[in-house]
């Protein structure tokens, strides 16, 4: 009897070892796709977005997370094995100008035909599309603001003195503030001198510039400010702090902030990378992200109810009304703008 038990135990151990070996072989046999992205909502993306792609393509997605600047710098330094990188258009343009991205074959990304025109080639036909668009507009507290905010020009009103914040020039939306300042002066095309004259005029109204959204939220919640430009995707945080807060698409139009996907130069997974980009643009992935309030959809086939669309940059009319900036022009001129900002505006 003892021998029988020993034999059964030995067989069990062999079976477990075999199972473990098979599991290891399965994992080792899978292709890996390294995706560089932000760390927010990681659980959602792993379960709802990445897992279906992994199962369908027998691939393992490995994430490299961090902010735009750090992740781009890692690739620039050459110590990265990233295949696909998600970046805001502002940082993606830097990567393009530094020669860090491969060109894409749009025949491998047919879902590009299903997205809004503005998202198809925000940085040129040779590079990746945008998979989401955030609106840069104005949030304000009607209980604290002496005027109703409907326009960019309202931020320059004398009534708003000591009541607003604006993004710092080095933040993602800082360059947009320069463009807005030119527009407020009545310029039909960008005029740098007019912009900085306009910015000088608004500075007495600025309590503090913000570099991080959390700074804006804190000032807003504590009643230090009554209004300021912000991306709509962060408005939920303001609404939680101040339930009466309102988000406004200015009469002159908001600005589009786009997050893009690009294939990193040197990858040996170019085809798989393009397949992944196509998948992210598909209706199913776009709809999941939108309905979970994670990203605003660019796929035109995604249909949302008013409740589902609340807080998202959604709908053809709104998307088409947004201003876009030439990111190459921004990057070529940003150093000069930063110098002028620090020299002329910072006291």
Report each predicted region and the residues it spans.
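C-terminal motif of bacterial Sec signal peptides marking the signal peptidase cleavage site
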Residues: 15-18
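Bacterial signal peptide processing site
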Residues: 20-22
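Early extracytoplasmic/lumenal segment of secretory-pathway proteins
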Residues: 28-94
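Extracytoplasmic ligand-binding site segments that recognize negatively charged/polar headgroups
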Residues: 40-46, 81-221
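A ligand-binding cleft/hinge motif common to bilobed small-molecule-binding domains
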Residues: 92-94, 221-222, 227-244
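Periplasmic-binding protein-like
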Residues: 134, 197-202, 242-265
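Mature extracytoplasmic/periplasmic domains
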Residues: 259, 264-322
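Conserved C-terminal helix/tail region of periplasmic/extracytoplasmic solute-binding proteins
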Residues: 320-347
